[in-house]
UniProtKB/Swiss-Prot annotation:
GN (gene name): dxs
Keyword Transferase included in the entry's annotation: yes
Main function: Catalyzes the acyloin condensation reaction between C atoms 2 and 3 of pyruvate and glyceraldehyde 3-phosphate to yield 1-deoxy-D-xylulose-5-phosphate (DXP).
Family (UniProt): Belongs to the transketolase family. DXPS subfamily.
Source taxonomy: Bacteria, Pseudomonadati, Pseudomonadota, Alphaproteobacteria, Hyphomicrobiales
Enzyme Commission no: 2.2.1.7
Pathway(s) it belongs to: Metabolic intermediate biosynthesis; 1-deoxy-D-xylulose 5-phosphate biosynthesis; 1-deoxy-D-xylulose 5-phosphate from D-glyceraldehyde 3-phosphate and pyruvate: step 1/1
Record's protein name: 1-deoxy-D-xylulose-5-phosphate synthase
Keyword Metal-binding attached: yes
Cofactor(s) essential for the protein: Mg(2+); thiamine diphosphate
Catalytic reaction equation(s): D-glyceraldehyde 3-phosphate + pyruvate + H(+) = 1-deoxy-D-xylulose 5-phosphate + CO2
One BP term from GO: thiamine biosynthetic process
Amino acid sequence: MSRPSTPLLDKAPTPDRLRALPEQDLPQLAEELRTELIDAVSTTGGHLGAGLGVVELTVALHHVFNTPYDRIIWDVGHQAYPHKILTGRRDRIRTLRQAGGLSGFTKRAESEYDPFGAAHSSTSISAGLGMAVASELSGEKRNVIAVIGDGSMSAGMAYEAMNNAGALDARLIVILNDNDMSIAPPTGAMSAYLARLVSGRTYRSVREAAKQVAQKLPKFLQDKARKSEEYARAFFTGGTLFEELGFYYVGPIDGHNLDHLLPVLKNVRDTQKGPVLIHVVTQKGKGYAPAEAAADKYHGVNKFDVITGKQAKPPANVPSYTKIFGTSLIEEARHDDKIVAVTAAMPTGTGLDLFGEAFPKRVFDVGIAEQHAVTFAAGLASEGYKPFCAIYSTFLQRGYDQVVHDVSIQNLPVRFPIDRAGLVGADGPTHAGSFDTGFLAALPGFVVMAASDEAELRHMVRTAAEYDEGPISFRYPRGDGVGVDLPERGSVLEIGKGRIVREGTKVALLSFGTRLQECLAAAEELGAAGLSTTVADARFAKPLDHDLIRRLAREHEVLVMVEEGAVGGFGSHVLQFLATDGLLDRGLKVRALTLPDIYQDHGKPDAMYAEAGLDRTGIVRTVFAALHRDELGHEALPTPFRA
């Protein structure tokens, strides 16, 4: 299939070439960029809607500002695909999120045009402020621009940064990309005119002169003059909140109209003082009818047909872990009206959209605010409710102090369903669920579980619902289950007790999480090599099943712990117990298989687990090495001594 014709885009592979184009060519360039983006993402999948919404803004920014000397920071990074195309990466744009290809987010190691990496929300203003202050300290004259969506503005970190920027009076430009029209819609030509007016030097010079005059007036007249000016500007343009934080507010303006964007950006670029916020209103999915009609479905997409918009989805023979969690929680909530659910802006991603349909008054979406979500859940628990605070593993990191201080220390029974545990593939290291076992199992009194399959997940939902002695968590991966039979309702598991799923005599494989299937496959191969193998499902990283571990250690020559987490997690806790209990004193060969002590780049999950040695082959190889056997399982002969 031939690619679309893009003559202007072909002439502007980098921002310096883009800046050489006349302004009248920029609308056509934007259309070609949009066409290229749609075609590229149709072949790779990825985040489409947000990028389509900032095409004109991206063109305008790189045309007005001297990148990469001037810094542009894209919050989250979902909207950065057009930026990548315009900054020398067009030839690799069809490798997005593929192994060895471009990251789906901004990444410092990838390009000098990515001054700050991102993937989690609401970091851009803080990073931009740090860069702006560094520029001032160095005597530089560079511009620093942070582009942040209205969704990301729901996080407290954004306001902390703005409050600090206003106090420092730093020269920082924040562009609020309002793509849900959730703050204020543009008001047409009058809005554009006012935006140009108030962003210009003349207006700001007159304003500063008026302030100087006002300072000579009595205090009560100074206050009246200030309030009158603020009221007049707020009446026409909005932005009172941002002004109170110390920002000079400009907008709202149409983010798809280059005639509106360019003069405002130039005016702000040429301003030499203080933080400025430009309120730009855009439309997610702009210029592609299917994405405009269903923005939620085109936020993140699989490969799709450009003509029809139909996404290619592999047939699912079994339900996803996320869906199993959602349906299991609904079942428990039917039996217990104290069960409530909390999500931090991820109802669909966590399966709580299903719960919300069944119990709309018992689900709470608190926005991108994981810290608040955790403490809000703690408050619910303190009043006798049973909150399930469902957060991705990678995002739970953002609320860890609240987990410790507000939940764990007070021993409040908050339930933490932890989705996206382990590796997540195309989203790479920023979204990998590597650390939750380590940082939760370190907390006194915290119950930490991991589901080995979808039936176990159903049991753990029931167990968490019934457990009122303190905080409890259960982790599960992205993707579909393994196809085991599901009970109609989960059973209550005995806290701190695992299970034997295969009996053997020589080797013991102790799995925590969904690597259990790989352990069973490895046991088959080891058995074929004459090594009788036990496979156990730990279920709990805390409290550990001491009786099970003692049995495995005493009755086997080799013990291998396997988990989908970083060093310092389940395996470390088992080793600590083995050492303390004296179980290492008799020559037991122990190995702990974890994710490697690196941030693994994006790729296919199966390939990434193989790289980590957490697949069947890696487990078998580890056992053979412990027993001094070669890759075929034969006992290695000692190297002959030579004088």
